[in-house]
């Protein structure tokens, strides 16, 4: 009975017999240099019983290799592929186009409405009547602008030709001395502008979000890979203990042999379970990132990807304040806009002044004898709208040329309405509004305090993550040098295969642990970038 040690990228074996343990140098072209450069997951196989193990390992290795062209940085290549697949910039552009259209609509609506039109009228004569039908045309021009205090200007003319001829021009102008129309339109414009700015920053926010999702997946993948490496080494170590026990002459039915065998079976089950968990994480990741296999790309993708994760320094937060956070500023601005919009909808106070001027001629033919009058009439209107009270006063002043009489007289017209329950309703509405304002102010204060506490801990967190990253990198470098020494010693036959497998296992775990530390640093910087709009700095 013998046991062989095999790395996934080359053919190097450690033969362990019942009496000795010796190392056989690699036989592939890459040799020991490839071992020290990329590392390997130690694999212990029992000869004659490794077919199922080899099939499982091939399935996992197929998920962890690059396609052709893997000479580029694997991390940047995966990130580029993810950005091209998800296209956050395209979605952000669509959202910006929608928000921009909303802003232009609000701006155009607040500028006013313009009406150009005409009315045409044709009437026949009734029974007993005589003469030609009546033809009428009425051009209309109107302008209404909520932005300029709800200004309204309209001009319409009336011209009727028939037995009677009427020609008249009416001009109407009105403006609000005080109302909430202008403020309401400005709030709509500000809200649309706020949504446009938020959509404009969409690409800046969405691109880091894609990288953050990739970082989360890589962290889970590297963590599972660490567990897989440890379980695999423990399984091989337990198998060696089992073989040594048998080589020492213990019977298979002895207590020690059964205990060693049970320990070996337990480590094997744990390894197979960890292998399945790793496959559950690795298979979706490989499918999303378009990771495939190839004759020229059979290499240890996980360890190469771990080496390719960029190393960064923490972003400086000295010149930043909690109020600089985009989320807090956007939330406060949106809260102010919502509160102003609610107030403008409830505020029904309005004082409106309007004037109407009508001028023209009216000629009536009776028995083909013309008798016509010319008149000029003006009217002014003042309307007051308050809670429970609506009042309107209108004054009409006709004017006729000297020597002629106007059919209309000077008149003053008034109209008023009173709703006593409206006052009580407004009182409760004002109380509700003040309570909502206090609640909103308290929410803004709590958000500011929360962001301030977060800012105080960010600087310390960045330093701690950077220190952990540097420690992990130094540990990885030390274990790489140790692995090189062990490989040289194993080539001379000084150390055995178990020591070499342990050194490779420790170095692989150190590589994955260093990659996780770099991912933590990346996540921290991307969080700062999203929150404050800074630019990450790459460490030398």
Curated annotation (Swiss-Prot):
Signal peptide: 1-20
The organism's place on the tree of life at top rank: Bacteria
Keywords: Signal
Family affiliation: Belongs to the TP096X family.
Protein name (Swiss-Prot/TrEMBL): Uncharacterized protein TP_0968
Species assigned in the record: Treponema pallidum (strain Nichols)
């Amino acid at each position: 009975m013998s046991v062989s040690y095999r790395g996934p990228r080359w053919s190097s074996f450690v033969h362990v017999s019942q009496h000795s343990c010796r190392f056989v140098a690699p036989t592939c072209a890459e040799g020991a240099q490839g071992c020290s450069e990329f590392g390997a997951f130690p694999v212990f196989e029992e000869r004659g019983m490794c077919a199922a193990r080899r099939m499982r390992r091939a399935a996992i290795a197929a998920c962890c290799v690059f396609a052709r062209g893997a000479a580029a940085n694997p991390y940047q290549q995966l990130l580029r592929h993810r950005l091209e697949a998800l296209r956050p910039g395209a979605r952000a552009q669509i959202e910006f186009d929608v928000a921009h259209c909303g802003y232009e609509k609000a701006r155009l609506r607040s500028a006013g409405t313009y009406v150009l039109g005409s009315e045409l009228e044709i009437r026949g004569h009734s029974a007993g009547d005589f003469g030609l039908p009546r033809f009428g045309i009425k051009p209309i021009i109107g302008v209404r602008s909520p932005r300029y205090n709800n200004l309204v200007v309209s001009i319409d003319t009336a011209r009727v030709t028939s037995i009677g001829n009427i020609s008249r021009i009416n001009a109407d102008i009105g403006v609000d001395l005080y109302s909430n129309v202008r403020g309401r339109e400005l709030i709509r414009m500000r809200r649309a502008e706020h949504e446009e700015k938020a959509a404009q920053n969409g690409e800046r926010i969405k691109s880091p979000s894609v990288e953050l999702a990739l970082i989360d997946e890589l962290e889970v993948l590297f963590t599972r890979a660490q567990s897989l490496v440890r379980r695999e080494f423990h399984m091989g170590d337990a198998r060696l203990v089992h073989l040594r026990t048998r080589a020492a002459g213990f019977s298979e039915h002895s207590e020690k042999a059964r205990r060693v065998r049970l320990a070996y079976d337990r480590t094997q089950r744990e390894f197979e379970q960890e292998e399945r968990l790793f496959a559950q994480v690795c298979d979706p990741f490989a499918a999303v990132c378009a990771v495939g296999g190839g004759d020229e790309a059979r290499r240890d993708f996980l360890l190469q990807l771990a080496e390719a994760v960029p190393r960064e320094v923490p972003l400086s937060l000295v010149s930043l304040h909690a109020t600089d956070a985009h989320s807090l500023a956007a939330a406060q601005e949106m809260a102010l806009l919502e509160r102003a919009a609610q107030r403008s909808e409830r505020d029904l106070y309005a004082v409106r002044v309007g004037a109407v001027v009508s001028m023209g001629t009216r000629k009536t033919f009776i028995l083909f004898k013309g008798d016509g009058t010319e008149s000029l009439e003006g009217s002014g209107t003042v309307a007051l709208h308050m809670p429970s009270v609506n009042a309107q006063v209108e004054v009409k002043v006709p004017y006729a040329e000297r020597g002629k009489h106007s059919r209309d007289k000077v008149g003053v017209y008034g109209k008023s309405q009173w709703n006593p329950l409206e006052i009580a309703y407004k009182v409760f509405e004002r109380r509700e509004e003040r309570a909502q304002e206090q609640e909103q102010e308290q929410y803004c204060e709590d958000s500011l305090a929360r962001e301030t506490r977060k800012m105080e801990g960010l600087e310390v967190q960045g330093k701690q993550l950077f220190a952990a990253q540097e420690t992990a990198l130094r540990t990885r470098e030390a274990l790489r040098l140790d692995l090189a020494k062990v490989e040289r010693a194993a080539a001379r036959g000084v150390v055995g295969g178990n020591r070499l497998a342990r050194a490779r296992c420790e170095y692989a775990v150190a590589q994955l642990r260093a990659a996780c530390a770099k991912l933590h640093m990346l996540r921290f910087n991307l969080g700062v970038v999203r929150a404050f709009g800074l630019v990450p700095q790459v460490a030398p």
